[in-house]
Amino acid sequence: MTVDLREEKELAQQRFKEICKHAKIVDTHNDFPYLLRVQLRNKLQLAEFDFENGLTSHTDLVKMRQGQVGVQFFSCFIECKNPNYLYQDFDTPTTVVRDTLEQIDVTRRLVCKYNNDLKFVDCADDAIAAFRNNGKIAIALGVEGLHQVDTSLAVLRQYYSLGVRYITLTHNCDNPFATAASSITGGLPDRGLSAYGIECIFEMNRLGMMVDLSHVSHRTMHDALDVTKAPVIFSHSSAYTLTEHERNVRDDVLERLKTNGGVVQVNFYQDFIRKPGSDRATIDDAADHILHIIKVAGWEHVGLGSDFDGIPQGPKGLEDVSKYPDLICKIIERTNATNEQIEGLMGLNVLRVWKKTELVALQLSKKLEPIESSWSGRKWEFYSYAKEFPELFPDAYKLNEKSTVWNYDQPLNIEK
């Protein structure tokens, strides 16, 4: 390394250190709770689980402090039910809601267990305070796919009441709301957003739930941008122009973020950021994706969504959560960015989206009632004896005959 390059690097580090006196890192996607599920069955009291002093995962408290993390969104992720990532029989009962609740529970218990260092946040102002202060790390919740609401907007509302503040419209499967990027990769048609999906976005806007467009198809991105009243996020996606993968964001969508106000949080997964022909992605590849998004959309529309602990390994130079400072310093070295622009990249951009989403909800909630629609393909099954109970009003039982299945001929048995 030449003297000039060494000095440039040292200056970037000094500047980052100064910025960190009043700004921290916000990461919108980390799958650490999934490791707790698949490896520990969500048991946090095991002696071997030493989150406070260091683990071999991408994430632990030591690495988070080293990485200058101020706000971390943990993903309450549960897989699509079909191992082939196809999701056509949407009305088959699953355990996905139970499993999602367990992930919300274990994340909140983690915060309680380490409450000297972590705190739970469910509003933008509290997250902004954590971003600005050198205190406890703020933990927020996201859900990675509307398959996890099991076709029900009522479940969506209950997730919000439990503190979930963004939901990804799809994971690696279609659902009644939207088309997934994985379906396009698999050769299936891009149907975009369904009519029910539009209603879902309106309900998310009404609640103050951020709309996450990572994992969705190209058409779904445009459809969502056409109807949402609030800015969107891409919680963990990168730039399609640099790495042509359906999980990434094309330039025509990046252009629309200037009007929508949304952000792309750059993902560190190898397949989404490495150069064609390269065996492994590097920290410079991640920086390239950040800079491309800035070039097309602007400094206000980019952030960090690593996908740590949901990917096998990080890029070279970005091996775990502790390495965020190296990436920010790389951007400082390669640009003439102002401190305000660097703060936006570090996390203020996505916190602005969160705050704007809350303000939109404040206005909509004054005018709109909760959306009571259900998926058109849903069958409501009841025991036949239910028809023996009093009607709420004449012919109430006939209102929903087309979607009702009376296929349980079990007699009413009331013990006196």
Swiss-Prot record:
InterPro entries linked: Metal_Hydrolase, Pept_M19
Domain of life: Eukaryota
Enzyme class: hydrolase
CDD domains: rDP_like (cd01301)
Swiss-Prot/TrEMBL catalytic activity: an L-aminoacyl-L-amino acid + H2O = 2 an L-alpha-amino acid
Family the entry assigns: Belongs to the metallo-dependent hydrolases superfamily. Peptidase M19 family.
Descriptive protein name: Uncharacterized dipeptidase C965.12
Species of origin: Schizosaccharomyces pombe (strain 972 / ATCC 24843)
Taxonomic lineage of the native organism: Eukaryota, Fungi, Dikarya, Ascomycota, Taphrinomycotina
